[in-house]
Amino acid sequence: MASSLMVPRAAGGTLRVVYEDIQASSGGGGVPVLLVHGFASSRRTNWVVPGWYRSFAAAGRRVIAFDHRGHGESEASHAAADYDEGLLAADCAAVLDACDVREADVFGYSMGAMVTIRLLLDHPSRVRRAVLGGLGANYLTPSPLKDSVPEALLAADPSTITDPGARGFRVFADAQKQDRVALAACWRRPRTTAGAAALATIRAPVLVICGETDAITGSPEPLAKLIPGAEARIVPRRDHMTAVGDRVTKDAVLAFLDA
């Protein structure tokens, strides 16, 4: 059953964030895993539908997952400042606090992987091991979709969207029945991409994993090389949307977190 907590807005006030804490059915004492979903997605779309809840349950893991502010069942804001990645990382820590968990393994996908990097930097004691899924070389460079995605999300007529990448985000957001104004604000959030010096301070073991044909993220190796001891994996013949639930991804993630 889902629960909720209140998290701070940038300029005062709070937003309601919905989360789930699913105890391992086997009663196993393994480290809990916190799942951090991607942009325009939700805990259900990113983790339940691809079978991650089942996979972690079979591994005896306690699963903690939540909907980012502005996504899924969580409360939305239309102010970009409310989606600052420092706030999103603090939400992760707040969810762990609500579940009385001091330290967890963390698996973030796409935007969730960006937030996981910020969690590793701002709250390092909360992360035992981390998986950065659907994130790679393109994290290190400005997104070519910086302006086109929010424009596509706010377009009155989707048929007028000419950028194929931006159109894909609009189609996905519509399929999820998300608040597109909130998503546009989230995309325009204040971003502080961690540079080489910051990434070099990460001490937790990290796995960077991407689909072979993922044009959104690029190759995992350039990002992994900047994080001390990080591993890089490529999921053959998979793109940004299909890599997340692939068997190769699941085997690699479960093996890494159990190491």
Give residue ranges: language-model regions.
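Conserved HGGG/HGGXW glycine-rich cap/lid loop of the alpha/beta-hydrolase fold
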Residues: 15-75
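Conserved alpha/beta-hydrolase "acid-adjacent" motif
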Residues: 215-220
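Flexible "cap/lid" loop of the alpha/beta hydrolase fold
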Residues: 114-157
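Hydrophobic, aromatic-rich cap/lid helix
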Residues: 170-195
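Catalytic histidine-centered segment of alpha/beta-hydrolase-like enzymes
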Residues: 238-250
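Short beta-strand/loop motif that positions the catalytic acidic residue
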Residues: 202, 208-210
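N-terminal cap/lid segment of alpha/beta-hydrolase-fold proteins
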Residues: 1-17
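Conserved acidic catalytic loop of the alpha/beta-hydrolase fold
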Residues: 86-104
